[in-house]
Amino acid sequence: PYATQPREGRGKDAADWYRINPHRLHLGVVGFEGLNPAELTEIDQTLDLMDGVIRSSFTTEGEKIAVTTACDPDADRFTATIEGKKHLPIAIRFAYPTGAHTDDASNWAADEKHSTELVASTEQSATLLRTIDTARYYVRLDWTGKATIAQKGRNHFTLTPEEDRWTIAAHFTPQETKATAEQQDILAVEGAATAFWNNFWMKGGVVDFSHCTDPRAKELERRVVLSQYLLAVQCAGPTPPQETGLTYNSWFGKFHLEMIYWHQAQFALYGHEDLLLRTLKWYHSAADGARHIAERQGFEGLRWMKMTDPDAMEAPSKVGSFLIWQQPHLIHLAELVYRATKDEAVLKNYYDLVMKTAEFMYSFATYDEANDRYILKGIIAAQETLRASENVNPPMELSSWHYGLSTAQLWRERMGEPRVAEWDTLLAKLSPLAKDAEGKLYLASEDATDSYTNIRFISDHPAVTGALGMYPESRLLDKEIMNNTIDKIFEVWNWDETW
């Protein structure tokens, strides 16, 4: 059985509930109290990529305010050092979650449904207890100099300084951090952030287009380097990132395993495999859930879910439950880490997961006895306009199956184990990419013979290109035909309906 979405009745209600829950919480908003953006002048803000700090300044009522913000690289804590003769109060506000599909996860009109309690304080610290339904977490505030904390509402506090220069720190944690007279060393956070980011840039690779003659090169370089920073900030946590990172909430805050490749494969290629390993550890804890899905559906090994959460629960979906292109990602990412490190510990740590992932891939493929080949069917392709009931042999998935099983065999050899004969048989007999009648273009799938005239097949992801764009060249495809296919896609694709 597949975890789908019934259209009505209790089944629909249950599926909707499991899609929404658990959902992401907004932990809190810390900012200046009562400022009117329209009244601010001389606004300037600079992100210092090298040191990992944001320097901001503005003028309000004739007084200049300067702020330096940094995040602790080892804890869910940030600091802000504020300078100015006008002693602006800081607001610490909390919202109730929305449970919505796409938003900022903040419902500011439900104060009565959650609470914030000041449970401890000293002259330079305070601990707030947040209670939202059955969820509890703490916010530890520390500051330098003299400041006064006050409760302005059920879930609204202010901290008003008496100094021209002071620093505030906010630490979000599931466990209470006792407020004591001995202040936490908040001034060290900025230095720790700078050390982390200096090491990030000096240790890893950075693109350099300075010798390019194309006038667009400088802007492209800026975007690529900024993306390296943004991905490190937003996509290097203990779980795979949601599609919109940390800035915004999408899909109820849940993450999609087919997307981890886009967000995190680059870490291993830029020399930051340690950041990728932070997330890959999650697959160990998720293995039981993946095993249960495979068993429930009659397959071997581990079937990695599409839409999930930190506890690896499979979200019901009329589309996601039929996707398979997330399946080889664990093998792909583990291989990239091994190539980057040549560390046998990586092989030992991920060997079982790689084998169990490949076991599912072998058991999922169907042997077509009439044509003496293996096929992939009963799936929705990465190009989600293809229907599970019709779709046979989408090209990117074929390439991913060939790559995943080939790499799993390579891991066996590295570990001194024999190759699995059945996997080699599948690799030898896996269907090549389907071509049009003239043999000049690759199709969206074997059944989609009108791939470049039917609007359904020229919308959504142009996933056929991923067969070579994401995976190495193999016997399944011909580069000349792929080049023809790319040219055709640029000629006819419905770009207004693609993503």
Regions found by a protein language model. Give the residues of each.
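Acidic/polar, glycine-enriched structural segments that form the non-catalytic walls/loops
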Residues: 1-254, 273, 284-291
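Primarily short, surface-exposed interaction patches in extracytoplasmic proteins
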Residues: 208-217, 221, 239-253, 263, ...
